[in-house]
Amino acid sequence: MKRPVPCLLPGLLLAGAACAQPTEGGALRNWFDDPFLALSRDQAGCPEPAGPRVSEAERRTQAHRRAEKGTTCWLAGEPDCAQSSAYRYDAGIADAIRADATLGATLAGSSVWITVQGRVVYAEGCVRDAAQAEALERRLRALPHVQQVIPLLRLQAGQPPPYRVFPGR
């Protein structure tokens, strides 16, 4: 059963430039093999997000939380938590996103990358306008097993992106 999730779009679209700084403390790497995919690359000048790539120090910080995420609802026997970890759903969610033929039209003129982490879908990149961002968020939220969608999308060229940028890209 889908639970309603409050719309986070307005607040997240206004995220500050502090979020856009590259991570300090070493090379970034996708330590946990979280699904990370480019859905579109139509908007020139849109910086590639760091996505799930983090430093060694950040990996150590995340490890404990990630080990526990999703086990509470599974242990309670909730019907939408058949897997023992929320991260076990991620590959299937990413496959559903790749297979969704309707996303192509939704993303025209944008550059969007997706990260899936523990049934949460992060949409990062640059879109034409708020309507396109809202359509993408609705489409992603409708996919099976997605608990939350977090849109970190730049609406206007020249503004700092509301996400961490992958250094050197």
Task: Show which residues each predicted segment covers.
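N-terminal targeting leaders
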Residues: K2-L8, L13, C19-R169
